[in-house]
Structure formats: structure tokens, C-alpha cells
Amino acid sequence: MLTRKQHELLLFIDRHLKQTGFSPSFDEMKDALNLRSKSGIHRLISALEERDFLRRRHHRARALEVLRLPETMPAATGKPPLAESGPPPVTAPATDESAAAESFVPNVIKGDFANRLAGASVATEAGAIHLPFYGRIAAGQPIEALRETGAQIEVPMNLLGHGEHYALEVAGDSMIEAGILDGDTVIIRRGDVAQNGQIVVALIDDQEVTLKRLRRRGSTIALEPANARYEPRIVPSDRVRIQGQLVGLLRRY
């Protein structure tokens, strides 16, 4: 269980990332927690790293990544946690899941993306970058393996961290309780490894592709939907290849 200060700092960083797209400075964290020096922030961040709640992106300034949120609140101290005060977080679709360690809170960029392909502009103050757009991926039932189309999509740079990325369009409703809706465009960090509880693009038998939450169970992998209407799909681990992890989401309004 986290201490109150660790809990407050984690929620402050998470809220700041959702509102601004980048990590708070050490001065901002120090002031938010009413600490006298930055050394206290360094100790709290190190403790959160050791408990796998937070990760520093090395070689980048102000680069912190929240890996998960705590399942329980800190012990009562007569003072409410930091997250209960201050401005509300960026609006995201409601989810039936609690703020569990593995819950994904969509970093939603709203806008008119009707003409977003083939170099169409998605203007943001933070700038934008072109990513490969691989078309629709089933969030309800697996579909054929992805084929490169040559299409591209322009996305805000603040959705991206380190690594190589690509974009997919969601088809289906099996991830709605994680805030991922039919027609959303998801941003995927390319990679072949993932932690338990992460939402991933999984390739099954080199033929089917699906967007689900990953759960390892001995020699098998459970690909879990975020919709009570669907059952998890249990597959031997040697039949599943991870194609990337979900890092962001675009929604057309």
C-alpha cells in the first residue's frame, strides 16, 4: 500500500499528464505536495518506481509515465488525497472498471478526423507527426492479420512517447468499459512484449488480430474484453504474438 504522499504524487502526475500531455516539473510537484525541497520528490518518485507505479523515460526531460494506479486509497489521515481537490481531469468516457492497477484511462483527443487520412491535418499547439494507418481492427471479434495500406494519419505529438508507433481504427464494442468505442482510432506503440493487464494488439496463429487486455495464465494467455457481454479468449501462449501496446486514442466528433 502506498503512503499518502506517494498516492498524492502519483495522482497529481497522472492528472497533469492527461491535462497537458507532459509530466509536471519538480517545482510543480514540490508545490503541489507542499514539500520544502525537491529531494523529497526524488525519493517519492524512486519509491513509486520500485513499486512499479511509475517509470522514468531516460534521456528525456520531464518524462514520467504512470504504469498503473493503486487499487486502494491511502490510510486515513484526516486530509483528503490530492486528487479530490484542484481542477478536474481531462474528460474521458465513463468506465465501469475501478481505478485498478491495470485500468486504461484513454488519452482522448477530440476533433473532426473525417478527412484525417492521406496527410490530412490534425492541428495542435504541440505539433503533429505522421503515423502508418493500418485500417480497422476488431474490438469485438478477431479479424484477418493487418495488411499495410500505405495510408498515414497525422496525430498530436503529445500522444506519443518513446518508440515506434502506428494507428488502427477500432471496430466493435468489446472494449467499451475501458472507454474504447467503435470507430475510435487507437495509437499503438510497436513492441512484442507487454505486462499483465496492458491493452495490446495481439496476433493469433499469425492470422487473426484483436485489441484486448492481456493476462498470462501459466502456459496460456487470456485476451480479455472490457464488456460483460463477451467472454475472454484463452489461447496457448505459443500461438499469440504481441504486436504493440495501446498508448493513446483519437475520437471523431
Curated annotation (Swiss-Prot):
- Per the UniProt record, which EC number(s) apply here? 3.4.21.88
Which residues carry out catalysis?
174, 212
Q: Highest taxon of the source?
A: Bacteria
Which processes are annotated in GO (biological process)?
Answer: DNA repair; DNA replication; negative regulation of DNA-templated transcription; proteolysis; SOS response
Q: Hey, where's the site called Cleavage on this chain?
A: 139-140
Keyword set, alphabetical order = Autocatalytic cleavage, DNA damage, DNA repair, DNA replication, DNA-binding, Hydrolase, Repressor, SOS response, Transcription, Transcription regulation
Q: Does the keyword Transcription apply?
A: yes
Q: Which reaction does it catalyse?
A: Hydrolysis of Ala-|-Gly bond in repressor LexA
GO MF entry, a single one: DNA binding
Record-annotated DNA-binding residue ranges = 26-46
Q: Where is this region: Disordered?
A: 73-97
Q: Which CDD domains match?
A: S24_LexA-like (cd06529)
Query: Which Gene3D superfamilies does this chain map to?
Result: Umud Fragment, subunit A, Winged helix-like DNA-binding domain superfamily/Winged helix DNA-binding domain
**Stored NCBIfam families:** lexA
Which family would the database say this protein is a member of?
Belongs to the peptidase S24 family.
Q: Which PANTHER family match?
A: LEXA REPRESSOR, LEXA REPRESSOR-RELATED
List, alphabetically, the HAMAP family matched.
LexA (MF_00015)
Assembly, per entry: Homodimer.
The protein's role, per its UniProt record: Represses a number of genes involved in the response to DNA damage (SOS response), including recA and lexA. In the presence of single-stranded DNA, RecA interacts with LexA causing an autocatalytic cleavage which disrupts the DNA-binding part of LexA, leading to derepression of the SOS regulon and eventually DNA repair.
| Name this polypeptide is given | LexA repressor
